[in-house]
Amino acid sequence: MIKDYKFDEIAEIFTGIRVKRYQKGITVKKKILKKTYEDSSNIETEDVQVSEDINPKFYSRKDDIVILLAGSTVSKLEKEGIIIPMYYAVVRVKEGFDVDFIYHLLKSDIFPRELHKIVEGTTLKIIKTTHLKEINLPIPDYETQVEYGRLFKLMDKRINLNQELIELERQNEKLIMKNLLEKLGDN
């Protein structure tokens, strides 16, 4: 059975931190999430010098979901301890809901359709976390979430492996061409 939930009923949702405020005084090197417009689990980070006074809630936890507020890109974080900057909404799924299912629901056609109703701006669409919290999402019972969450996670792994295979094939193609040209050049 599917039930509609407001987004803030299934997850804690808040905006990341304004990093520049923490770059004065005594600082340490930390990883920060880079802005990305690609839907992916392959998250890029960069090193920045920041104060150690940053509230722990702004550091990533395993299975955090982040949504880029200026483009609605949805990503799932596997690594802990990465600073999440203010141009991301952090989604921490509450107990009783499956993280993998919620992540894939947010990547589905349903979420962008609901999001389209609330975004502001003409040229650059901006998402506000207060509006995000009001989005209605259809959620099945927990067992169904877990079952399909596992399926989607396995499908993601297969997609990533196939992408790696494609990249290896491209490298092989270049290497074969290079070897051919070297061989023909020796004659």
Residue ranges of model-derived segments:
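A general structural signal for short secondary-structure boundary/capping elements
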Residues: 76-81, 110-117, 133-139, 152-153, ...
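A short glycine-rich beta-alpha junction/loop motif
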Residues: 82-86, 121-147, 153
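Short, surface-exposed loop/turn microsegments at beta-strand edges and helix-strand junctions
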Residues: 23-30, 57-60, 76-87
